[in-house]
Amino acid sequence: MKHPSYYLLATVLLFAGCSSDTPAGDDNTTFSPLPEANASLYETDQVFTDVTAMTVKNSYGAYVTSQCYTKTEESDGNVHNPCFTCHVNSVEPNYIDDAALQESYAFSEATYKNPWSNLFVDRTDAVAAVSDAAILAYVRGDNYFDANGSIMLGEILKHVPDAWDYNHDGQWGGFVPDCYFAFDGEGFDRDPGGDYTGWRAFAYYPFPGTFWPTNGSTDDVLIRLPEVMRQNKEGVFDKEVYKLNLAIVEALIKRSDIAIEPVDEKVYGVDLNQNGTLDNTSKVVYRWAAPSYDFETKRFYNYAMYYVGRAQNAQIDNALHMAPGLYPEQTEFLHTVRYLDVDANGSVGMAPRMKELRYGRKSAWNTYPQLSNAAQAEIKDKDAFPNRLRTITGNEETGLNTGLGWVYQGFIEDKEGYLRPQSYEETLFCIGCHSGIGAVVDSTFVFPRKFDGGAKQRGWYHWTQSDSGFQEIKEPVLADGRYEYTLYLEANHAGDEFRGNDEVTARFFDGNGSLIPSEIEALHSDISRLIVPSKARAMMLNKAYRVIVEEQGYIYGRDAHVAPAANVHQQVAVDTPTGIKAVTMERYPLQ
């Protein structure tokens, strides 16, 4: 069977609104594409959902994800372990180190009942009622830009609706979407006037499991460093300075050398290649030693590595910080989660329509000791009060705090497909993964997974800038030498946490449940064989998620599925063994 290719629409199509050549369907069921209206019409005509309430209707433990309730043991004794991707031995300064959670359902009296009831809803009839033509028209509709090219949310938030205004002061105090998804040849986003927005796209290995397109969504991620890191020492925007600072941050996050375009270190006054002299270099060398600390002035000095431009001065002044495994303060990430599009050839790719627009910002710097103390305090609190839930501060307008220096905020589709702010309870869904597991690097998943110097544009590009998508991208290899996706298949014996992806099972496993060697060998050279769905599966998952959107029941789960999930507990006794023997790994840097 020929495996489906993965394509990504050109930017002009991605953001041009609904396609005019949608194939005809065989029934009359339709979803109307989002009207192409200007922002003022959207503001006056749209019924704005009230999302300001802090009341939690379903679960204060919504930071415990649906995947955590998966059944790991089958009646025949077979054991499945998708848990190790998130709950794993961590690297300092992530002190969570929670590989032991693979081995038991370490819930509390407040979380042992699965609150994600949407998993058990049968949507067979609702999905069957939707034609392919209808869902394609819907996912090709643009719910980010209006017909004039303005960012709809940006226009609305200039005069924030009272239904979205948490403190009812008439001002939006949170993130205002400002990315135009108009990327130059180096992945930098430009606004309509040609100016840099600061956002830069990068390509990466999708995180195992849920975030593979075969399980329902495509996505992209962009990074933006604070303004001081985009400026030269005169305080003027300088793209070359910004590129170097991004490379330095990448080296610190990956703890490895990073290839760059040849530069003259004398221009920047920083020994990037750490050879003791200012000369020409084609790499940022990662070599770290803890800086000195003056207890009298309470300042760090004598760093082993330095930023360039104005950021170097800020670092020396201790207004900007640096450490391995940590981003500088005010680093931002933008993450869109999208539907799957299918072209006339059956190739599956990124749809224009966004399911979610997710935003994260590092609001405060925490030292290694502070992060360690926070982790230890969490452990002590859990031991002393096992049934006490975490207290997550924040609100839907300004975002929710992780407690580790990050703020997360999101926008999600309303019933008609427009993007709206997530409520407090809907945003709780994001917090557990970004602050309570061993897999993250300074609260993030993807930047450590960015493609390296051997990739196109050294990994600095948006998916829409690649004609081949995931085809012929080699499987990531862990720092310990094991193939990462193969390890997932070996440990989980499935292609997703719920073991509902029949396509992956049929392709990679034989009748006895053993991996097929020839398929694994092919996977090593082409990850699209695993992570890209067929046209039929893509359409099915699009329809299933659209039904959830119409219901607006995100607080009960947003996992796209048709039949009720069979391999998930509705409740499980506290500390029940999973039957798993914990998997540990040395994950980064990926090879």
Give residue spans per PLM region.
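Sec-dependent signal peptide recognition
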Residues: 2-10
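Long, low-complexity intrinsically disordered regions enriched in Ser/Thr, Asp/Glu, Pro/Gly
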Residues: 7-8, 19-22
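C-terminal motif of bacterial Sec signal peptides marking the signal peptidase cleavage site
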Residues: 15-17
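Sequence context surrounding c-type heme c attachment/ligation sites in exported
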Residues: 21-158, 163-165, 174, 349-591
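Extracytoplasmic redox metalloprotein regions
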Residues: 75, 79-84, 88-329, 334-341, ...
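Extended interaction-bearing regions that mediate binding to partners or small molecules
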Residues: 345-346
